[in-house]
């Protein structure tokens, strides 16, 4: 639907609309065995959707490793992203100081545009014990963050599909995404995460605070974690969608 819109199609929308009967959108998938907290050797402790006890260990050890205050009841909001404008970082920089007045911690992993690298590095210096900015690419640390965080923030301006929100779900870390592209197609409120529609910093902050409030209800949060972790984002599902499409094409 988005590529039929002039904003996203960059002038090609008339052609796309004329040929929309030829279009079919299929989500990417992830390696559900490669991203499996029960067997992932990068984690501080294994766990599964049936038993999240190991995730508590992962969180405590992540806090220790990154120099964050050791607090099991403080939700960790994480971003693993390329530091680029279209990833929604201007929304984060607008309201993160306000968000950090609440009982939350913030962890960032990524590299990219130098002004964002510097900005988040300075943020970590201003909030010792609450913020960890890791300006690097580190596959091992990314797994530790996926497993140790509570909330995964992905406020992209545009995102054709996105994989990070799927990986976060697999590790029982609840995504907050903006409703664009594949993020809208993969994350559904009350089912496996939180969403907001408008590209607006305060709309994002409202949803973050909603999630942080819900986090305090441990029983309901555990149910949300289970639903997220058991969402089928495997390539098996995507492959079936491709197979169905190919069969439909053979009819013409």
List each language-model region with its residue ranges.
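Catalytic cores of nucleotide-sugar-dependent glycosyltransferases that transfer UDP/GDP/TDP-activated
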Residues: 1-252
């Amino acid at each position: 639907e988005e590529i039929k819109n002039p904003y996203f199609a960059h002038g090609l929308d008339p052609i796309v609309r004329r040929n929309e009967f030829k279009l079919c959108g299929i989500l990417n998938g992830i390696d559900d065995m490669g991203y499996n907290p029960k067997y992932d050797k990068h984690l501080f402790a294994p766990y599964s959707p049936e038993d999240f006890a190991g995730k508590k260990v992962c969180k405590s050890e992540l806090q220790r490793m990154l120099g964050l205050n050791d607090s099991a009841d403080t939700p960790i909001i994480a971003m693993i992203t390329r530091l680029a404008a279209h990833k929604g970082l201007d929304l984060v920089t607008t309201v993160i100081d306000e968000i950090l007045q609440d009982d939350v911690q913030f962890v960032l992993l990524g590299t990219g545009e130098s002004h964002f690298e510097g900005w988040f590095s300075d943020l970590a210096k201003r909030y010792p014990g609450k913020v960890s900015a890791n300006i690097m690419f580190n596959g091992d640390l990314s797994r530790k963050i996926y497993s140790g965080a509570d909330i995964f923030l992905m406020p992209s301006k545009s995102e054709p599909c996105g994989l990070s929100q799927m990986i976060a779900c697999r590790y029982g870390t609840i995504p907050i995404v903006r409703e664009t592209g594949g993020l809208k197609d993969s994350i559904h409120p009350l089912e496996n995460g939180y969403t907001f529609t408008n590209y607006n910093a305060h709309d994002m902050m409202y949803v973050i605070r909603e999630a942080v409030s819900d986090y305090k209800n441990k029983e309901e949060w555990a149910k949300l974690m289970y639903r997220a972790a058991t969402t089928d984002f495997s390539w098996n599902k995507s492959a079936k969608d491709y197979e169905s499409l190919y069969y439909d094409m053979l009819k013409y």
